[in-house]
C-alpha cells in the first residue's frame, strides 16, 4: 500500500515484483556509476590546465569506449530478459479469473465456477467508512487464495483500459476484442490496490482495482457464500 510522501515502490507482494525491485536497484546502481564517471571526466577536463594538442587519435581509447558500453548494456539486458520471461510464464494456474473493463468499472468472472461473477464499482467518497481509502475502495473485491498461481484474462467491453496492481508487479492492457492474460502468485495475505492505467474517458480516475489475498480455506468459504447468493 502506498503512503504519503513515498519515494520508492510499494512493498512487493509477489515473486515477480521482488525480482523487479532487485532489477531496479541493479540498474539504478549502474546508472549512478556511469553518471559519476561522466561528471568526474567533465570536471577534470574543465579544471585541468594541462593540454596535449598532438593527440589526434588513440586506438586504445576507442577500443575502451566501444567495449565498455557494450558490457554495460549486456549487464542490464540479461536480468531484464530473465524477468520478461518470468512475467510471461504461466504454468498450471490453480484459478482463472476473467477481468473485463467497462466505462467506468471492472467486472470479474471466476471461470472455474459455474456462476461466480460480479461487477466492481468504486465506493463514493460520502459512503466510505473510517479506515477506507478515497478513490481506491470498491463494493466488491477480487478475492483470491494466497500462495497459489492465479491467471487473469483481461479484456474490455468498450475502450482501452489497463488492469494494474503495483504491489503484484502486474499491468495488463484491456483491449476490446482481444483477450490478454497475466499471472501472479501472492506471497502473503492482504489487500492490494490498483487503478485503471489507461486513459479511458471522463471517469478514468474512478475505476479502482482491489485484490484481497486470503488463505485457501477462507477463499473456499467466500466462494461458497457467493455461489449461494447468486
UniProtKB/Swiss-Prot annotation:
Details of cofactor binding: Binds a dinuclear copper A center per subunit.
UniProt topological domain (Mitochondrial matrix) ranges: 46-59
Gene3D superfamilies listed in its UniProt record: 1.10.287.90, Cupredoxins - blue copper proteins
Membrane topology note: Multi-pass membrane protein
Gene name per UniProt: MT-CO2
Binding locations of Mg(2+): 198
Family: Belongs to the cytochrome c oxidase subunit 2 family.
Catalysed reaction equations from the record: 4 Fe(II)-[cytochrome c] + O2 + 8 H(+)(in) = 4 Fe(III)-[cytochrome c] + 2 H2O + 4 H(+)(out)
Pfam families: COX2, COX2_TM
Lineage: superkingdom: Eukaryota
Molecular function terms from GO: copper ion binding; cytochrome-c oxidase activity
Keywords linked to the UniProt accession: Copper, Electron transport, Magnesium, Membrane, Metal-binding, Mitochondrion, Mitochondrion inner membrane, Respiratory chain, Translocase, Transmembrane, Transmembrane helix, Transport
InterPro entries associated with the record: CcO_II (IPR045187), CcO_II-like_C (IPR002429), CcO_II_C (IPR034210), Copper_CuA (IPR001505), Cupredoxin (IPR008972), Cyt_c_oxidase_su2 (IPR014222), Cyt_c_oxidase_su2_TM_dom (IPR011759), Cyt_c_oxidase_su2_TM_sf (IPR036257)
SUPFAM superfamilies tied to this protein: Cupredoxins, Cytochrome c oxidase subunit II-like, transmembrane region
Transmembrane segments: 15-45, 60-87
Record GO biological process: ATP synthesis coupled electron transport
Required cofactor(s): Cu cation
Compartment(s) where it occurs, according to its Swiss-Prot or TrEMBL record: Mitochondrion inner membrane
EC numbers on record: 7.1.1.9
PROSITE patterns assigned to the protein according to its UniProt record, in alphabetical order: COX2 (PS00078), COX2_CUA (PS50857), COX2_TM (PS50999)
Protein name: Cytochrome c oxidase subunit 2
Assembly and binders: Component of the cytochrome c oxidase (complex IV, CIV), a multisubunit enzyme composed of 14 subunits. The complex is composed of a catalytic core of 3 subunits MT-CO1, MT-CO2 and MT-CO3, encoded in the mitochondrial DNA, and 11 supernumerary subunits COX4I, COX5A, COX5B, COX6A, COX6B, COX6C, COX7A, COX7B, COX7C, COX8 and NDUFA4, which are encoded in the nuclear genome.
GO cellular component: mitochondrial inner membrane; respiratory chain complex IV
Positions annotated to bind Cu cation A2: 196, 198, 200, 204
Biological role: Component of the cytochrome c oxidase, the last enzyme in the mitochondrial electron transport chain which drives oxidative phosphorylation. The respiratory chain contains 3 multisubunit complexes succinate dehydrogenase (complex II, CII), ubiquinol-cytochrome c oxidoreductase (cytochrome b-c1 complex, complex III, CIII) and cytochrome c oxidase (complex IV, CIV), that cooperate to transfer electrons derived from NADH and succinate to molecular oxygen, creating an electrochemical gradient over the inner membrane that drives transmembrane transport and the ATP synthase.
